[in-house]
Amino acid sequence: MEWRDEGLIIGVRQYGEASVILEAMTRGHGRHLGLVRGGRSQRMRAVLQPGNSAELVWRARLDEQLGTWAIEPTQLRAATLMASAEALHAVGLICALLRLIAERDPHPDLYETAVLIAGHIGDERLAPLLVRLEIEILRETGFGLDLSRCAATGAREDLAYVSPKSGRAVSLAAGAPYRERLLPLPPFLRDEAPGGEPTPQDVLDGFGLTGFFLKRDVFTPRGQGMPEARRAYLAEFSKRQERSATE
């Protein structure tokens, strides 16, 4: 068997003395693993860094086998990652999130979002896209949020909260008596949200929202903690905001 696809490298682990097992998120074949012979060579180590994009050819005698990769890099991002701890941790977070997807299960829209983010990994305005990626991960793992209308009234305007029980939006008026028990819904995640760049607090509220559901519904049931890359990314994001506030 053989197929060709484009992919985003999300992980590498040693296999024997000279080879590695490469994990990639591909457009048409989902999260997929394969052996890269000679993958520990100096030349290949630079190619096989998480966050790089490549044209991939997978070959195996049978579909259920691990198979082997042939790799042609299309975008190397090491220089950007070495220049920014925030970008480095953002890539780590992307990879950790994509590993939540079942192996060999195609998710082309999720792939497109991940590649879009990776392509702008050095952009300091990246954070809202990472929040949206986490929302997509929740949806693709069966825990999608409904942020389109109020769970109590059906209204589509003035949505301000999310119920931690149902994952559904709640309007400002309907949620006012219970606001201490609800999660804030930042404006940039609402359908009727005006244009403009989200504030740092909006972004942190977005991560707080997605983080609550990711921890409760996805990571904890799998016996996993929240990704260290996520904590590190948010720490770097917050430090940058503090520096900006004092300049």
UniProtKB/Swiss-Prot annotation:
Gene3D superfamilies per record: Nucleic acid-binding proteins, Recombination protein O, C-terminal domain
Keywords carried by this UniProt record: DNA damage, DNA recombination, DNA repair
SUPFAM superfamilies xrefs: ArfGap/RecO-like zinc finger, Nucleic acid-binding proteins
GO biological process: DNA recombination; double-strand break repair
Residue ranges crossing the lipid bilayer per the database entry: none
Top-level taxonomic group: Bacteria
Keyword check for DNA repair: yes
Pfam families per UniProt: RecO_C, RecO_N
Homology family: Belongs to the RecO family.
UniProt function note: Involved in DNA repair and RecF pathway recombination.
Name the UniProt record assigns to this protein: DNA repair protein RecO
Gene it is expressed from: recO
